[in-house]
């Protein structure tokens, strides 16, 4: 199992959403299936942190979609 963390713009995956996690990873709109970290089996889980967002504090008018479009940086994999 791969768990993706840090998606403030992500949406839940369900039957109503047309796009899935793979669409988000390719830069399109999509959704994530959020999991509780306490429920993961340590031997079978891999945690990935991303996407990360930078916010310019001087520009208070930046909205979430603007941040997603201009400041998205994906970390491939983080193991610990």
UniProtKB/Swiss-Prot annotation:
InterPro entries associated with the record: Orthopox_F7
Induction: Expressed in the early phase of the viral replicative cycle.
Keywords assigned: Early protein
Domain of life of the organism encoding this protein: Viruses
Family, similarity comment: Belongs to the orthopoxvirus OPG051 family.
Record's protein name: Protein OPG051
Species of the source: Vaccinia virus (strain Western Reserve)
Gene: OPG051
């Amino acid at each position: 199992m791969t768990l993706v963390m840090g998606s403030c713009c992500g949406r839940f995956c369900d039957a109503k959403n047309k796009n899935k996690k793979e669409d988000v990873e390719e830069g399109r709109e999509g959704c994530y299936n959020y999991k509780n970290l306490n429920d993961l089996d340590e031997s079978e889980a891999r945690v990935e942190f991303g996407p990360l967002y930078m916010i310019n504090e001087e520009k208070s008018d930046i909205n979430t979609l603007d941040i997603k479009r201009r400041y998205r940086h994906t970390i491939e994999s983080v193991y610990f």
